[in-house]
Amino acid sequence: MGLLTILKKMKQKERELRLLMLGLDNAGKTTILKKFNGEDVDTISPTLGFNIKTLEHRGFKLNIWDVGGQKSLRSYWRNYFESTDGLIWVVDSADRQRMQDCQRELQSLLVEERLAGATLLIFANKQDLPGALSCNAIQEALELDSIRSHHWRIQGCSAVTGEDLLPGIDWLLDDISSRVFTAD
């Protein structure tokens, strides 16, 4: 029995996953996390540092790291990459002016060695706002079709209403499970 097999078996028992949620400031990362956890989302302030929540969902223990997206904090993102099973990239669909910045930051994450193999879920958040870009427009702006290094999916959602958060999370868990909890 090889080390990888032993590690997979240990991880299978725990069914514990580490999810890293990143994105530009004001994209809605903390709101998504709180909504998913059933918390009030009326009064949320910018994350200066990070939040960690441990949630149970579909028999998984999810350790979700929500890291602030202000420009001054982005250089610290790399401190959170270790052992990440899934990366959730949150996009403010109504913030057309920063799509290029958003694309640049995402592309720089995807070449990080410690994120290699992590499943990527892109939440196109704020779909409930007038003028929000469609998932197709965001897919094009972020050049998602060029991603070959990670399994990825874009999911439109609204953190405030909670609409379409679960389908995205469920896809992420299914994709990670197919890689991490494989039968030998």
Curated annotation (Swiss-Prot):
Organism domain of life: Eukaryota
Per the record, the major location class is mitochondrion
Q: Which residues carry this modification: Phosphoserine?
A: 45
Query: Is Nucleus tagged as a keyword?
Result: yes
> For GTP, which residues are the binding ones?
23-30, 66-70, 125-128
Q: What does UniProt note about where in the body, tissue by tissue, this protein is expressed?
A: Expressed in brain, lung, cerebellum, liver, kidney, hippocampus, spleen, cortex and heart (at protein level).
Q: What does this protein do?
A: Small GTP-binding protein which cycles between an inactive GDP-bound and an active GTP-bound form, and the rate of cycling is regulated by guanine nucleotide exchange factors (GEF) and GTPase-activating proteins (GAP). GTP-binding protein that does not act as an allosteric activator of the cholera toxin catalytic subunit. Regulates formation of new microtubules and centrosome integrity. Prevents the TBCD-induced microtubule destruction. Participates in association with TBCD, in the disassembly of the apical junction complexes.
Its name, as the record gives it, is ADP-ribosylation factor-like protein 2
* Organism phylogeny: Eukaryota, Metazoa, Chordata, Craniata, Vertebrata
Q: Which gene encodes it?
A: Arl2
